[in-house]
Amino acid sequence: MLLVIGSKNLSSTNM
């Protein structure tokens, strides 16, 4: 679950 959140967080930060 943490991995999924981290992935989404990175995507948001990139955007």
Swiss-Prot record:
GO MF annotation list: glutathione transferase activity
GO CC term (a single one): cytoplasm
Keyword check for Electron transport: no
EC number(s) from the headed UniProt entry: 2.5.1.18
Keywords noted in UniProt: Cytoplasm, Transferase
Reactions the enzyme catalyzes: RX + glutathione = an S-substituted glutathione + a halide anion + H(+)
Subcellular location: Cytoplasm
Family listed: Belongs to the GST superfamily.
Subunit-structure text: Monomer and homodimer.
Biological role: Conjugation of reduced glutathione to a wide number of exogenous and endogenous hydrophobic electrophiles.
Name of the protein described by the UniProt record: Glutathione S-transferase
Organism classification: Bacteria, Pseudomonadati, Pseudomonadota, Gammaproteobacteria, Pseudomonadales
